[in-house]
Amino acid sequence: MNRLYNMTKEDNIFFAKRKIIDNIYKSANLEGIAVTFADTVDFYNNVNNGKISVDNMLKLKGLKDAWEYILNSIDDDLTINYIKKIHFEICKGQNVNPLGEFRETGVGITGTSWRPKLPSECDYEKELNDILNNPDKQDLAINLFCWI
């Protein structure tokens, strides 16, 4: 199969850094944080435009810190503990429990009756290892994206 993209690690890091503000903005909106793209640019550049609530600033800071953590630890192995650390970075400063750990209660998704399993009902180590052992890197990336 011909690959549409054949980017090096350095290419991917460059692309991620170029798209970081857009990624933070879109993640924030997905989570219901009411910010504009311009607000996100200002926040990322440490400009307080007075339009973002303190609560939303903490949420944006968590997203920014998580991206910085990922970019600064790019050579670390992807493990369950690494994923938990990213969760910690995203949620620190917010009222999220347990912070940096798997949830212990059920959750719902607006607009659907589907409920994900509790983490205690899953074998995340095995699931992650199965995905990471896929020899097709593009398939691995797609499956990992959907799994996380």
Spell out what each predicted region is.
Residues 1-148:
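FIC/Doc superfamily catalytic core
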